[in-house]
Swiss-Prot record:
Residues 88-110, 466-494 are annotated as: Disordered. Changing A136M: Stabilizes the active conformation of the hexamer. Decreases affinity for UDP-xylose, but not for UDP-glucose. Disrupts hysteresis and cooperativity. Changing C276 to A/S: Loss of enzyme activity. Changing H449R: In DEE84; uncertain significance. Its EC number is 1.1.1.22. Changing P175A: In DEE84; uncertain significance. Changing A44V: In DEE84; severely decreased protein stability; decreased hexamer formation; severe decrease of UDP-glucose 6-dehydrogenase activity. Keywords: Acetylation, Allosteric enzyme, Carbohydrate metabolism, Disease variant, Epilepsy, NAD, Oxidoreductase, Phosphoprotein. NAD(+) binds at residues 11-16, 36, 41, 89-93, 130-132, 165, 276-279, 346. This is UDP-glucose 6-dehydrogenase. GO terms for biological process: chondroitin sulfate proteoglycan biosynthetic process; gastrulation with mouth forming second; glycosaminoglycan biosynthetic process; heparan sulfate proteoglycan biosynthetic process; neuron development; protein hexamerization; UDP-glucuronate biosynthetic process. Changing V303I: In DEE84; uncertain significance; may affect splicing.
Length: 494
């Protein structure tokens, strides 16, 4: 069996960096080199301050960096020396041309394939780590075949990641499963077994699943679509709970005890975010349309539509409760990352909520323990603009949650950081304008509602009626309409 002794990973982001750090940590005899064109990112990986925050990552990196784990911008040499090359580059949703707003943009995958074949000789395994549309491996294979040379043998595998940001190291060390897809040929199966041997250093063999390449690629898209679907499903029930007096947490507990359903991903919130869910579901929608499956495409599109609705609905409740206007009012936004225990803001619901409120003229004071000011400014600015006038005028980045809440009309919790449960809310209430509102978009304050109401707060949360006095936002109850793909930069229609 072919033995993998040197690994190259192209892409030092949220997937490539942690994944290869754990491989190096678990396989001290394998030399792992993570490469990227971004020199500042590589410098950060080689410094005490890593470019991404992930619990446990720093300890893993420091245990093997400089021994069998290396970070470099020398991509060509790393490819030449490697027995296995992971492709772990970004596959964003296309923002132009055919498939705009839905299809995956594979330009970085194509660039990697061309660079790999240019710098390879002999036998080498090339493995997709990035989330890609079905049959992306076939496209890579066609590039390899069109640029073949004597004695070159490149085998293409699919090995999608299933880690969750915030628990990535735990997920990598103790995965539910490892999925490897390859060609159903002797050469393809030889490559599959070689990669299996790497994971078998710490993963039980029964947890390593092998399939054909297409099943592996589709399994990743389907897994993210199913998880997103569950969140949208419970969020749809949260709207019903608010209208009827039911509590979505109690409903989720009741249905989650059914073993056929289970209790995972039944946490109602202001909406899902992150780099994967929306991108992958939209990719699935586009794939279904391209394969002439319009009914299937419409089904999965509803998952995204419900997520968009949940965000708009929450923004509407804020405006509704604050006497139909937030113009020139100070609102504290607690949390900007898309989830706790990460600094990743991609598709964060906090971005959407902030933009909705900014378009109503609200002054936002934003605090997040792990997201730097520069990232918040970029996320709230128009594309291609370093910092637009609206952001300069309406957004302040606070150094701590108490500063953000000082003099605020309302506190809006958008990320479920544990620290928000431990704040001195009596201190916060004293410094806020009255009536003082808390809008808990993540239900992190469940169990504290009576205490907070005793202090004097008006509480609004997802999927439960807490405060009873509310002023209708509009006689019709209509929710402002915003474009799904283009967060609002215009006044809502009411």
């Amino acid at each position: 069996m072919f033995e993998i002794k040197k690994i190259c990973c192209i892409g030092a982001g949220y997937v490539g960096g942690p994944t290869c750090s754990v491989i190096a940590h678990m396989c001290p005899e394998i030399r792992v080199t993570v490469v990227d064109v971004n020199e500042s990112r590589i410098n950060a990986w080689n410094s005490p301050t890593l470019p991404i925050y992930e619990p446990g990552l720093k300890e893993v990196v420091e245990s093997c960096r400089g021994k069998n784990l290396f970070f470099s911008t020398n991509i060509d040499d790393a490819i030449k020396e490697a027995d296995l090359v992971f492709i772990s580059v970004n596959t964003p949703t296309k923002t132009y041309g055919m498939g705009k707003g839905r299809a995956a943009d594979l330009k970085y995958i194509e660039a990697c394939a061309r660079r790999i074949v240019q710098n390879s000789n002999g036998y080498k395994i090339v493995t997709e780590k990035s989330t890609v549309p079905v049959r992306a491996a076939e496209s890579i294979r066609r590039i390899f075949d069109a640029n073949t040379k004597p004695n070159l043998n490149l085998q293409v595998l699919s090995n999608p990641e299933f880690l969750a940001e915030g628990t990535a190291i735990k997920d990598l060390k103790n995965p539910d499963r490892v999925l490897i897809g390859g060609d159903e040929t002797p050469e393809g199966q030889r490559a599959v077994q070689a990669l299996c041997a790497v994971y078998e250093h710490w993963v039980p063999r029964e947890k390593i699943l092998t399939t054909n390449t297409w099943s592996s690629e589709l399994s990743k898209l389907a897994a993210n679509a199913f998880l997103a679907q569950r969140i949208s499903s419970i969020n749809s029930i949260s709207a019903l709970c608010e209208a009827t007096g039911a509590d979505v947490e109690e409903v989720a507990t009741a249905i989650g005890m059914d073993q056929r359903i289970g209790n995972k991903f039944l946490k109602a919130s202001v909406g899902f975010g992150g780099s994967c869910f929306q991108k992958d579901v939209l990719n699935l929608v586009y794939l279904c349309e391209a394969l002439n499956l319009p009914e299937v495409a419409r089904y999965w599109q509803q998952v995204i539509d419900m997520n968009d609705y949940q965000r708009r609905r929450f923004a509407s409740r804020i405006i509704d409760s604050l006497f139909n206007t937030v113009t020139d009012k100070k609102i504290a936004i607690l949390g900007f990352a898309f989830k706790k225990d990460t600094g990743d803001t991609r598709e964060s619901s906090s971005i959407y909520i902030s933009k909705y409120l900014m378009d109503e003229g609200a002054h936002l004071h934003i605090y997040d323990p792990k997201v730097p000011r520069e990232q918040i400014v970029v996320d709230l600015s128009h594309p291609g603009v370093s910092e637009d006038d609206q952001v300069s005028r309406l957004v302040t980045i606070s150094k701590d949650p108490y500063e953000a809440c000082d003099g605020a009309h309302a506190v809006v919790i958008c990320t479920e950081w544990d620290m928000f449960k431990e704040l001195d809310y009596e201190r916060i209430h004293k410094k806020m304008l009255k009536p003082a509102f808390i809008f808990d978009g993540r239900r992190v304050l469940d169990g504290l509602h009576n205490e907070l109401q005793t202090i004097g707060f008006q509480i609004e949360t997802i999927g439960k009626k807490v405060s009873s006095k509310r002023i209708p936002y509009a006689p019709s109850g209509e929710i402002p309409k915003f474009s799904l793909q283009d967060p609002p930069n215009k006044k809502p229609k009411v």
